[in-house]
């Protein structure tokens, strides 16, 4: 059972205030290092988290963990009575026409030409990372292009797929007590410099998608290196945002 599962709300999962522990525990690290090509199910990933105590009582703090998103993915799959990837395709990818975006469900499934992700070794040299997307599950097992990412940034930031009241609720937030760099974390997305969207990092890739609801501008940034001690796309975005904001609307 999820620690405090009888008290946690769906909103608390989405705004990172549930207290759910992170699934990337020492036990998970040991299992992954022993077999980097092992295919993990979402249930298996969640099980690593469930072996740990809750970080805090629901609603007490806001600490970002990918376990929250894994749990939401399971809720979505149960609600629609479909595998999570099928729900994403049917209700997001296809309606938005994201023809270059995929939810990856297998190890090394990324087809066609694509960048290799790198992390820095202890000696400072970049090392290529494998493409085991099953390690990420609903928390990040997707591939895309900058063009599609810009389209997604607009849809996410404007609430194109949601009722207006739902989108307004999603814009309510507060700073994280611990987690990725955001000015505030909202409901399933974050804010930076008055823009809303999300960042991500995994397997040597770092990304950012942001949308300005006032101007309608969207920005997507992707890099094929991580473990630099800071999220570089966020650093770039903070420099880019004032420039884009200064451009008069067309």
Tell where the protein language model's regions lie, with residue ranges.
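Alpha-helical scaffold elements that line and support the substrate/ligand-binding pocket
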Residues: 13, 50, 63-97, 148-155, ...
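The feature captures the short pre-catalytic strand/loop hairpin that immediately precedes
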Residues: 43-55, 119-134
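Catalytic loop of the DD-peptidase/beta-lactamase superfamily, centered on the K-T-G motif
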Residues: 86-90, 94, 127-250
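Secretory-pathway/luminal and periplasmic proteins that interact with or process carbohydrate-rich
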Residues: 2-9, 18-25, 95-105, 175-184
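Active-site-proximal loop and beta-strand segments within enzyme catalytic domains
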Residues: 1-65
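Mid-domain, small-residue-enriched loop/turn segments at the edges of structured enzyme/sensor domains
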Residues: 9, 67-68, 100-106, 114, ...
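Solvent-exposed, acidic/flexible segments
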Residues: 3-7, 38-42, 61-69, 77, ...
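Short, well-structured active-site flanking segments
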Residues: 1, 79-107, 163-168
